[in-house]
Amino acid sequence: MADEHQFIHDGLQRTQIDEFFSEELSRAGYGGMEVAKTPMGTQIVLKAEKPGMVIGKGGKNIRKITTTLEEEFGLEDPQVDVQEVDEPDLNAQIVADRLANALERGWYFRKAGHTTIDRIMESGALGAEIILSGKVTGARSRVEKFNRGYIKHNGEPAESIVDSGVGTAVMKLGTIGVQVKIIPPEAELPDDFEVYEDIEVEDFVEEPEGDVEELLEAPEDAEAESVGADPEEVIEEETEAEAVEEVAEEEIIDEEGVEAETGDAPTSPPDAAEEPDEALDEDVEAEAEELLDEMEDETTDEEET
């Protein structure tokens, strides 16, 4: 069988099984099914408002359903699991069957529609829509819609988020089709967004190295050492530290005073300025000695003459 025909065959088989359950389990509150084919057989999960009625006394009803699925629909080793619906008012199939039964019992369509959609919204649904089509009143068919909240009609969210169900009400004038769409409370819509507040960044604190016990013992050891030291030694150490600080302060003050006396920025030490004066004095003394020697020589020459 080609792939296209296989898809058509599987879809048709699934629709036929769904219609079978809807007719067979209408009084039990049929709420839909899930079919999964595995190598061990076909796994079917039924959702019902009253699971006890689906199973039957001693499992009689569930065995009958299993035999029918295997013989009429050709399913290999069907395994049926029944689950109870937590909130029937949020299951579109159950709501559609209830509304169809209310119309068959003689409820006015507007009262039935508004009452049903109000119960859906009170259960926490984000949105709901009910469509009644057929001979609602009179001989002419028409369409009546009831809307509440937010509903998606197309796109991927309409298939994955919206829960839909259909029902049929058989009236004297003709049939009325019932279509129900519900968006459950936990649905995440694609256009929803959330604004987060700014996160306060805390200062980075380095984690201390070592075990917790070692970190707790370290302060105790330091305190023990300080307590065990002699008071006299502690006083001597303090006085020595104070004396060193005083000497350092005096040196700083002396240096500042010298700088103020010598000028803003001395380029050479004081000894370097005195050296040229000493050289000049030596030259003057040498010249004076030479003059004295010349004068003595002149006097000696005069005496000889």
From Swiss-Prot:
Entry keyword annotation includes RNA-binding: yes
Pfam families in UniProt: KH_2 (PF07650), Ribosomal_S3_C (PF00189)
Stretch list, region Disordered: 207-305
SMART domains cross-referenced by the UniProt entry: KH
Alphabetic keyword roster: Ribonucleoprotein, Ribosomal protein, RNA-binding, rRNA-binding
Protein task: Binds the lower part of the 30S subunit head.
UniProt-recorded name of the protein: Small ribosomal subunit protein uS3
Top-level taxonomy: Archaea, Methanobacteriati, Methanobacteriota, Stenosarchaea group, Halobacteria
